[in-house]
Amino acid sequence: MYHTVVIGGGCLGAATAISLQKKLHKINKKEKVCLIEKSVLCAAESSRHSGIVRAANADNDASIMASLSTDYWSDLRKVWGVEMETEKFGAIWIAKNNQDGENPVWEELSERMKKINLVFEKIDKNSTIEKCSDTIITSDSEAYYYEPAALQIDPSILRSTIYDALDDSGVDVMEKTEVDIILSETSTITSCSTNNGIIKGKNFVNAVGAWSSHLFSKIGLKIPVTIEPVSVVNWMESPKQIKHEYPIIADYTNLCYFRSWRGNKLHAHQPRKRSVYEIAKNFINDLCAMNGGEYLNEPMNQSLPYNQIKNYEDIASKRFSN
């Protein structure tokens, strides 16, 4: 019997398994952690998270946690016992000024970030161009802020690092293992039935994500899940125009994030609306719906309709001269 069974081998599930197993080692417990994944670990990592790690946030608590996360990713050996290369290119945030040529919301945000020792500083157009080259289109009507601590993670490197950390910590990994049924006695989950047999555990962690409601509804647990569809596009670019060492561009004028991949690819995705109305609408449709789950962050441009790809192209043309 395992101390803990983590169901779901995405980034969060894998990180949970690694941390739990290391904690058990630290307190001299000989018990084991098992990580179950229906396909292979972090299969959607390249498209789903875009590898952007930044901390500036309107919510102070979120900023503090994100800043800690940045520190952990930068020195992963202290946390997981393995090293990982990160790309520290920083991030440039862009937003419209008001009629007076100011952006009081971001000015106030910059001051609040100072109080938690996070640099989110206003820069001028010339500094922006210096950091990005003349490929970026700037305007006097916009405000530019620089977050030097923001970093990028290459998803393929992250995936390899997760496998190394799981091996290093001694987690039992079961890939291509699909959970059919969660088994319980009274109100306690005791085991799960899979295509590779029954797996027993004292504790179970739900890291299934969008499919949680489907899996756990069989034992009467209602887990509300709603997902806002987000699609991404990737363009091949010339290294003479957009270099790999390009800052993350958080473009709130055109509502789009840009980052450069290795091999001179330009990645773009639009931020989620995080609208209370939109989320409520999804919940009204189905309290436990996987609404949009099958479309979430498709990595291939071919999966998007032409008008959506064209939308990204139009946005990119407003920000980049090439």
PLM region descriptions:
Residues 145-203:
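Helical element adjacent to the flavin cofactor pocket in flavoenzyme catalytic cores
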Residues 12, 41, 211:
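Conserved Rossmann-like nucleotide-cofactor binding loop
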Residues 1-12, 34:
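Beta1/beta-strand and adjacent pyrophosphate-binding region of the FAD-binding site
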Residues 60, 64-67, 93-105, 145-164, ...:
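Short beta-strand to alpha-helix junction loop
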Residues 50-131, 141, 255-258, 293-296:
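Dinucleotide-binding Rossmann-like beta1-alpha1 core, especially the glycine-rich loop
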Residues 18, 22-26, 160, 164, ...:
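Short, well-ordered alpha-helices that flank and scaffold nucleotide-derived cofactor binding pockets
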Residues 21-46:
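Glycine-rich FAD pyrophosphate-binding loop
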Residues 18-22, 54, 81-90, 203-322:
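Active-site substrate-recognition segment that forms the wall
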